[in-house]
UniProtKB/Swiss-Prot annotation:
Protein name: Large ribosomal subunit protein uL3
A Pfam family the protein falls into: Ribosomal_L3
Lineage: Bacteria, Pseudomonadati, Pseudomonadota, Gammaproteobacteria, Candidatus Pseudothioglobaceae
Cross-referenced HAMAP family: Ribosomal_uL3_B
Similarity comment text for this entry: Belongs to the universal ribosomal protein uL3 family.
Provenance organism: Ruthia magnifica subsp. Calyptogena magnifica
Gene: rplC
Length: 238
């Protein structure tokens, strides 16, 4: 997995191009990601970078740390970082680990393809029709109170039980969901906002993890190379 960033879902809108085409996009706010811990193979058994973002504050805007456990305070104190709104981890290669103390929105550019990981909206206890898209029974005369029933759940005497994993009614949503290969349409560095084509999981103000998609690695490398060439040309012209 490549290094990524943690952002906050703002909502959805649409972007209109010069030719009049409309693109639905998700808006993600990405504040500065501060590196809290660097994990190595020798110490932890794998290579990863742990980051945080934002600051816990009360309604008055004051730092809210009195309810933070001492162990968490000590964890942040090791790198002299301010206590954030959570901890997120990105698995990286050993050669990708640097001495940097933070990562910003400059990691992404328009044209990059990313994977977005978030927690889906909780729907509570739902029936088979909504949870698994089961077909409804007849809504006609003769069907009594069984319109949304799931039907048979198994055999009778043999095996005399319901098989594990049978699709039935139950809790729906509130689980980790990954949307892959979403294209970044626009990056607003001044406001720390990126616009990603399509929808992303989670509710408004929910946190999401964004990382470069390995399935589109060739395209991502070409985009990064073009940006570097443009920057080099600008330096030469100046």
């Amino acid at each position: 997995m490549a290094m990524g960033l943690v952002g906050q879902k703002i909502g959805m809108t649409r972007l209109i191009s010069d030719d009049g085409s409309i693109t639905p996009v998700s808006v993600i706010k990405i504040e500065l990601n501060r590196i809290v811990q660097t994990k190595t193979v020798d110490t932890n058994g794998y290579s990863a970078i742990q980051v945080t973002t934002g600051v816990k504050v009360n309604k008055k805007g004051e730092a809210k740390v009195h309810r933070v456990p001492a162990a968490i305070k000590g964890h942040y104190a090791k790198t002299s970082q301010e206590i954030g709104l959570g901890l997120w981890e990105f698995r990286v290669e050993a050669d990708e680990i640097t001495d940097a103390t933070s990562v910003d929105i400059s990691l992404f550019s328009a044209g990059h393809y990313v994977n977005v990981v978030g927690r889906s909206k909780g729907k509570g206890f739902q029936g088979g029709v909504k949870r698994h898209n089961f077909q409804m029974q007849d809504a006609t005369h003769g069907n009594s109170i069984s319109h949304r029933a799931i039907g048979s759940t198994g055999q009778c005497q043999e095996p005399g039980r319901v098989f594990k994993g049978k699709k039935m009614a139950g809790h729906m949503g509130n689980e980790q969901v990954t949307q892959e290969c979403l294209k970044i349409v626009k990056v607003d560095s001044e406001r720390n906002i990126i616009f990603v084509k399509g929808s992303i999981p989670g509710a408004t103000k929910g946190f999401v993890k964004i990382s470069l998609s390995s399935k589109k690695n060739k395209i991502n490398q070409e985009v990064s190379k073009n940006i570097q060439n443009q920057a080099t040309n600008e330096v030469v012209l100046n």
